[in-house]
Regions:
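Phosphate/NTP-binding elements of NTP-utilizing enzymes
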Residues: 1-174
Length: 174
């Protein structure tokens, strides 16, 4: 950003989202741009990976650059924490952050087999309304969280059709 490093100070709606992430296993978020929700999701994923052992967190984004940006946000948040809070060793590359406690955060672009062989603690799907073949991808991903894993599916709107829209409508009806 033009102002350099910015301290993460949350807004009430962001706090509400984090509370929903904790209270509900499956979450869908309809958002506008530049609300900081991807940053909040990165911070939430980091919290889960740091404070709980053996968490497998997968982030799926529309393209590789967006996935890379997510791991950069995780790394930035991690490096901004007090030294006493950071696990002694972590590995970072453009695709993944791994921790000594067995937890990892992986961010990848969408593909039809994304995450299919994984058992996930947390699945984050960013800009889901813009993912081609999201219905097929979601069907495959759903089984990765079937043993108690959590999901956060977020997107800006992209018309009144497609799997993201269908999931949103189902959530609104509940």
């Amino acid at each position: 950003p033009i102002r350099g490093k910015i301290k993460l100070e949350t807004y009430n709606f962001q706090d509400d989202c984090v509370k929903a992430f904790e209270d509900h296993r499956l979450n869908i978020v309809l958002k506008s741009r530049q609300l900081g929700l991807s940053t909040i999701c990165a911070a939430y994923a980091l919290w889960m990976a740091l404070f709980f052992k053996n968490k497998n967190i997968l982030v799926i984004a529309t393209k590789f650059a967006t996935a890379q940006n997510f791991t950069k946000k995780v790394k930035y948040a991690l490096e901004s924490l007090p030294k006493w809070l950071i696990l002694p060793n972590f590995e970072y590359n453009q695709k993944e952050v791994r921790f000594d406690n067995g937890s990892k955060i992986t961010a990848i672009p969408t593909s039809e087999d994304a995450g299919r062989s994984e058992a996930l603690s947390l699945l984050i799907v960013d800009e889901a309304a813009f993912i081609k073949n999201f219905e097929e991808i979601w069907t495959g991903l759903n089984s990765t969280i079937s043993r108690g894993g959590r999901a956060i599916v977020l997107s800006t709107p992209n018309g009144a059709e497609g799997q993201y829209y269908h999931l949103w409508q189902q959530a609104e009806a509940k």
